[in-house]
């Protein structure tokens, strides 16, 4: 069991929506970014649990960004996690993100 799957399994905080078989794939591709200044963007954040999972997994140097259409999600911001409200189908909105996020190393569309 890798650290992502362990976090998911032991999580008692915010709800995380992920397919369990994704964790091995995520870990294989993302582990090299741990403890770096990685910029992660996740589109579709639901309850915000996966943003917290990414923050813990990548470490304190990481900057985690969430994108969701639901204005409620803005309330899920915390230190190290910034949330933008908008529609991923809106090209103008997506273009504006490139002005607000200095770089994107990992983009997760959930």
Where are the predicted features?
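A short alpha-helical cap/connector motif
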Residues: 1-108
């Amino acid at each position: 069991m890798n650290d992502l799957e362990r976090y998911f399994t032991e999580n008692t905080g915010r709800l995380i929506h992920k397919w369990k078989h994704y964790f091995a794939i995520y870990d294989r591709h993302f582990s090299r970014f741990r403890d770096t200044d990685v910029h992660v963007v996740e589109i579709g954040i639901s309850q915000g649990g996966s943003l917290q999972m990414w923050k813990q997994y990548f470490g304190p140097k990481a900057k985690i960004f969430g994108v969701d259409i639901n204005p409620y999600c803005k309330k899920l911001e915390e230190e190290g996690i910034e949330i933008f409200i908008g529609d991923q189908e809106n090209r103008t909105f997506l273009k504006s993100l490139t002005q607000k996020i200095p770089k994107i190393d990992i983009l997760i569309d959930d």
